[in-house]
Amino acid sequence: MLPVLYTGLAGLLLLPLLLTCCCPYLLQDVRFFLQLANMARQVRSYRQRRPVRTILHVFLEQARKTPHKPFLLFRDETLTYAQVDRRSNQVARALHDHLGLRQGDCVALFMGNEPAYVWLWLGLLKLGCPMACLNYNIRAKSLLHCFQCCGAKVLLASPELHEAVEEVLPTLKKEGVSVFYVSRTSNTNGVDTVLDKVDGVSADPIPESWRSEVTFTTPAVYIYTSGTTGLPKAATINHHRLWYGTSLALRSGIKAHDVIYTTMPLYHSAALMIGLHGCIVVGATFALRSKFSASQFWDDCRKYNATVIQYIGELLRYLCNTPQKPNDRDHKVKIALGNGLRGDVWREFIKRFGDIHIYEFYASTEGNIGFMNYPRKIGAVGRENYLQKKVVRHELIKYDVEKDEPVRDANGYCIKVPKGEVGLLICKITELTPFFGYAGGKTQTEKKKLRDVFKKGDVYFNSGDLLMIDRENFIYFHDRVGDTFRWKGENVATTEVADIVGLVDFVEEVNVYGVPVPGHEGRIGMASIKMKENYEFNGKKLFQHISEYLPSYSRPRFLRIQDTIEITGTFKHRKVTLMEEGFNPSVIKDTLYFMDDTEKTYVPMTEDIYNAIIDKTLKL
């Protein structure tokens, strides 16, 4: 009996070791799933309360519990939770009394990062008014489109943006829109001021009755897609979704003693929903900068004693491109939270700036699915959790890049891809994973839905992203469906090509896209390149490099050297104009190169080469 008992005990002792060997991420997977389940349980309980519990309620509690704690840091200014609470009370009262706003009235903010953005937002929450976050880089037609599609009644704008406001003011006035500068004076006829009105009212708490009709499905904020391929769409973010935006901050281990430093624009979900709201939920401090500056980034981190930084897109690469300094590791940053980080930049960043825990995630502003790389595997955007998938029904399906649609079988249903293959990410639309769509009509919302996916009547959210899941269940971003192009019968992922080209020593930044060629099917690869300072272009070196790492069909046949590469406010490359301009040297003033297979180098693009391509006397 004793030998059997000892054998059983030995087996129990060895079980954790065996599980670790066979399933090295099991404990992390279980822990992450339990955290998500707990979050879902909490949100469900918040929805059942009357009134429903929102992010605003948490802020009010933080202001009562820790009134003197620093909440906002901006330049040399420090604002406590109590100060921001009182200022946002004044905002709500001024908008209510002087502007006549009532719950449900949408207000558009057109301004950069500053404390006023935060207390205006909190003031609108206290009124039950949704906020439309306008990108301060947009102008004219795009600005009017964004304003109109959310149904806003009021525009609050920074006086620094007066030229953009004056350009659209006649149209806004015709539509009965009230326009105000967030200032005490105005030099524009027809534009009033709001700060003088805020200054002149009481800072007493706002009655709950002013927002009594707010529910979990009430729109709280409209956040716009980046508009890399057309006019931006206004994603509807309700109070239910605001809660899930904070989960990434919680999952990355941010605590009340942390200082979160962000240079991301507050009109974007990363800064607003993850950074600011995550800060409020844990009771931390939020350090804000008006715009990203690579040269001032670490000085700011030291100034504010930042422990958490946010990044998106190419931001960390910009930091790695700055000249090295002896104090590169002299900071308190321990967590970096964001997305879009290439594996090579990840390695370089932690090697140079220290052992910072980088939490890469995959998500979209409007989407109903997200992943987090909680084991912090370099290069992955997340991890597919077996337990999570049982609840959040998502799949990768085959996608025809040329036809720009999912591949369906003989019965008309979508086809799942096996591990290791690239597929389109979709997620079933359910009560637990809803898709709330876009403001301004149902057409755009319906375009993001896939119907009859695996059976009649089912509906899935189409992420528009091509991903790959490896055999260890780590998830890798491949490309956007609109960015991937087809050449010589093969799919070409622009991100993959850009990563390879970007490894060449003289390349500072690269934007890859496909351009049409008359008389040819598909699109051929082209790369816009920004050169590093004090480096010269070397066509032979680039040819050798891409020939070693890329198949012939995905090598960029044309290069365009630019002084600056145009990006959106969230560091995404703009491609549409470049694609339209193509590779015609008589149209494009930038220096162009053509990949010459015979000479094994890139040669200057000439009219003769262009004409030979058009005449088909030069084979591509």
Curated annotation (Swiss-Prot):
Chain ranges on the Lumenal side, renumbered to this chain: 1-4, 128-267
Gene3D superfamilies per UniProt: 3.30.300.30, N-terminal domain of ligase-like
Topological relation to the membrane, as annotated: Multi-pass membrane protein; Peripheral membrane protein
Reactions mediated catalytically: a fatty acid(in) = a fatty acid(out); (9Z)-octadecenoate(out) = (9Z)-octadecenoate(in); a long-chain fatty acid + ATP + CoA = a long-chain fatty acyl-CoA + AMP + diphosphate; (5Z,8Z,11Z,14Z)-eicosatetraenoate + ATP + CoA = (5Z,8Z,11Z,14Z)-eicosatetraenoyl-CoA + AMP + diphosphate
UniProt keywords, alphabetically: Acetylation, ATP-binding, Cell membrane, Endoplasmic reticulum, Fatty acid metabolism, Ligase, Lipid metabolism, Lipid transport, Membrane, Microsome, Nucleotide-binding, Peroxisome, Phosphoprotein, Transmembrane, Transmembrane helix, Transport
Entry keyword Ligase: yes
Superkingdom as given in the UniProt entry: Eukaryota
Cell compartment(s), UniProt: Endoplasmic reticulum membrane; Peroxisome membrane; Cell membrane; Microsome
GO cellular component, one term: endoplasmic reticulum membrane
Modified residues (Phosphothreonine): 577
GO MF entries: arachidonate-CoA ligase activity; ATP binding; cholate-CoA ligase activity; enzyme binding; fatty acid transmembrane transporter activity; long-chain fatty acid transmembrane transporter activity; long-chain fatty acid-CoA ligase activity; phytanate-CoA ligase activity
Stored Pfam families: AMP-binding (PF00501), AMP-binding_C (PF13193)
Family membership: Belongs to the ATP-dependent AMP-binding enzyme family.
Protein name (database record): Long-chain fatty acid transport protein 2
Organism: Rattus norvegicus (Rat)
Organismal lineage: Eukaryota, Metazoa, Chordata, Craniata, Vertebrata
Gene this chain is encoded by: Slc27a2
